[in-house]
UniProtKB/Swiss-Prot annotation:
<keyword id="KW-0678">Repressor</keyword>
<keyword id="KW-0479">Metal-binding</keyword>
<feature type="binding site">
    <location>
        <position position="73"/>
    </location>
    <ligand>
        <name>a divalent metal cation</name>
    </ligand>
</feature>
<feature type="short sequence motif" description="RCR-2">
    <location>
        <begin position="71"/>
        <end position="73"/>
    </location>
</feature>
<dbReference type="GO" id="GO:0005198">
    <property type="term" value="F:structural molecule activity"/>
</dbReference>
<dbReference type="GO" id="GO:0046872">
    <property type="term" value="F:metal ion binding"/>
</dbReference>
<feature type="domain" description="CRESS-DNA virus Rep endonuclease">
    <location>
        <begin position="22"/>
        <end position="125"/>
    </location>
</feature>
<dbReference type="GO" id="GO:0016779">
    <property type="term" value="F:nucleotidyltransferase activity"/>
</dbReference>
<dbReference type="Pfam" id="PF00799">
    <property type="entry name" value="Gemini_AL1"/>
</dbReference>
<feature type="compositionally biased region" description="Low complexity">
    <location>
        <begin position="1"/>
        <end position="17"/>
    </location>
</feature>
<keyword id="KW-0547">Nucleotide-binding</keyword>
<keyword id="KW-0548">Nucleotidyltransferase</keyword>
<keyword id="KW-0808">Transferase</keyword>
<dbReference type="InterPro" id="IPR001301">
    <property type="entry name" value="Gemini_AL1_CLV"/>
</dbReference>
<feature type="short sequence motif" description="RCR-1">
    <location>
        <begin position="29"/>
        <end position="32"/>
    </location>
</feature>
<dbReference type="InterPro" id="IPR001191">
    <property type="entry name" value="Gemini_AL1_REP"/>
</dbReference>
<keyword id="KW-0235">DNA replication</keyword>
Length: 217
C-alpha cells in the first residue's frame, strides 16, 4: 500500500502557478555604488532599456564620497508599470544597483539633487498633487462659531453643515445658540402715552409748597 502524500508536498506550487513579480512599479530609485560611468552614459543605457515602458522622466546624479569613490543615484518615472523578476534588469556594464520602488518622488528628487557631482536628466518630473486636508468636525464647528453673527445664522449654518446632528440634537444646538448670542433685554415701553401723564393741580400746589418752604435752624 502506498503511503499518503504529505501535506507539504500537496501544497507545493504546480507548473501552472505564476510567480509573484519581484518588481512591479512605475517609479524606481536606483543607486549604483562604485560606478565610474558618467550620468549621461548611464541615462542613455537605461533609456534604451526602458523604451517600451515609455519613460516619462529619468534623472541621474553623481555623488563622490570622502574617499573619492563615485556613486550614481537615479530616479526613474515610467508611464506604464515595469513588472519583472530579473534581479539584473537594471545592471549596466557590470554595475549592479540597489533597487527601491518609489512612493514619494518629490523626496527622492530632492535627495539626489543635493549630490556633489554632475547630473543629467530627460523628460518632465511628475509630482503627485497633494489633496488639501479636510477640516475636522471640531474645526468646522469652530468656523461656524467664529463666522456667525446671531442665533439664526448660527443655527442655519449648523443645520447645513451637520444635518444628522441637527435632527437628533436640535435642543442642544438651540441652547448653545442662546449661550453664544445673548439678546439684550427689551426696551421698556409704557402702556400710557406721554400726553396722558398729567400732574393734578392739587399735587402741583403741594410740591410748590414743599420745595419753596424756607426753614430756619
Amino acid at each position: 500500500m502506498r503511503a499518503p502524500a504529505s501535506s507539504a508536498a500537496s501544497n507545493r506550487p504546480g507548473p501552472s502557478n505564476h510567480p509573484t513579480p519581484r518588481w512591479n512599479s512605475k517609479q524606481f530609485f536606483l543607486t549604483y555604488p562604485h560606478c565610474n560611468l558618467t550620468p549621461s552614459e548611464l541615462m542613455k543605457e537605461l533609456f534604451s532599456r526602458l523604451t517600451e515602458k515609455i519613460p516619462g522622466y529619468i534623472k541621474v546624479s553623481q555623488e563622490f564620497h570622502k574617499d573619492g569613490d563615485p556613486h550614481l543615484h537615479v530616479l526613474i518615472q515610467l508611464n506604464t508599470k515595469l513588472c519583472t523578476r530579473n534581479p539584473k534588469f537594471f545592471d549596466v556594464q557590470g554595475f549592479h544597483p540597489n533597487i527601491q520602488p518609489v512612493r514619494d518622488a518629490e523626496k527622492v528628487f530632492g535627495y539626489i539633487s543635493k549630490t556633489n557631482g554632475d547630473s543629467d536628466e530627460m523628460g518632465e518630473l511628475q509630482l503627485r498633487i497633494k489633496k488639501p486636508e479636510k477640516p475636522t468636525r471640531d474645526q468646522r464647528m469652530a468656523m461656524i462659531i467664529a463666522s456667525s453673527t446671531n442665533r439664526n445664522e448660527y443655527l442655519s449654518m449648523v443645520r447645513k453643515e451637520f444635518p444628522f446632528d441637527w435632527a437628533i440634537r436640535l435642543q442642544q444646538f438651540e441652547y448653545s445658540a442662546a449661550a453664544l448670542f445673548t439678546e439684550p433685554p427689551p426696551v421698556y415701553q409704557s402702556p400710557f402715552p406721554n400726553e396722558q401723564i398729567v400732574c393734578p393741580p392739587e399735587l402741583v400746589d403741594i410740591i410748590d409748597q414743599e420745595w419753596n418752604q424756607v426753614t430756619t435752624d
